[in-house]
Amino acid sequence: MSNPFTPALLWNLADEFGTPLWVYDAATIRERIAQLKAFDTVRFAQKACSNIHILKLMREQGVKVDAVSRGEILRALAAGFTPGFGEPAEIVFTADVMDEATLATVVEHKVPVNAGSIDMLGQLAAVSKGHHVWLRINPGFGHGHSNKTNTGGEHSKHGIWHSELEEALEAIKAGGLVLAGLHMHIGSGVDYGHLQEVCGAMVKLVERAKTAGVDLHAISAGGGLSIPYKKGDATIDTAHYHGLWDAARKQAEAVVGHSLGLELEPGRFLVAESGVLLGTVRATKNAGSNHFVLVDTGFNE
């Protein structure tokens, strides 16, 4: 990993603006976006960084946005993203549950919903016939660089359980909703062998949707692309990553008989290496064998 900032620059910024201070390098973000240009749609998981100026930069680069809360939908709108049922939509809302205020917001602005529970489909259909939805499917397995980032398998609350796909598709048909696509995000960190398994699972889901008589327009590879946290850590091979998913997309297209969009939903991959947090040391103290350095940034360890 590289550091785009010189010590002198950071000192000057701290002197000019004070601390604590977040500093981002736009060129690094643009470079990361360019690495993923082979995907039809790059959709930024803004939970990684919902700074309005970062969101505006994403929009200027042609990146779409994913929101996981009503607040994130409003931030996307404030950054200039256009709501609506486009293909691809500029804003998609992803969640496993919706409160009434969030439901009203996605209906008002025609924001497609990436549903992680079947109940969401009925709630949406009751107030917004024709609404576009994605189905986030839990394939029954997961992967992550830690248990906290593993979002697949029976111990994860995220996504509709794979065996309930047909029930979800029936809810879409019965509710007069429109299926935009199928989504699968099972965790953070990249293992190419495991990724191949995920791609195969997606193709099988598309086959089942075809059998159920429900068409779709796209598939989403989710996110979780890894970054190097320290010198010597491996970097992701984005060309290989795309190649695996593109092969799966082509298999899925053969099933449905028409072209399918291929989305990717990176978060930290686009921003984590672009920013630094500047703080000022305000105190130091000892506690037995431990030495603490106290800064003005809060608990951001």
Residue ranges and their predicted role:
Residues 1-131, 170, 174-178, 211:
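A charged N-terminal "starter" segment
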Residues 112-123, 154-164, 188-201, 236, ...:
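Active-site glycine- and acidic-residue-rich loops that bind
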Residues 27-28, 45-51, 68-71, 96-98, ...:
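Active-site beta-loop-alpha junctions enriched in small/polar residues
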Residues 131-164:
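Flexible glycine-/small-residue-enriched beta->alpha junction loops
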Residues 76, 161-177, 202-216, 248-249:
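Structured alpha-helical segments in the cores of large, soluble enzyme domains
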Residues 41-43, 62-65, 88-92, 110-112, ...:
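Structural preference for beta-strand elements that scaffold enzyme active sites
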Residues 192-301:
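C-terminal active-site-proximal or functional interface alpha/beta core segments in diverse enzymes
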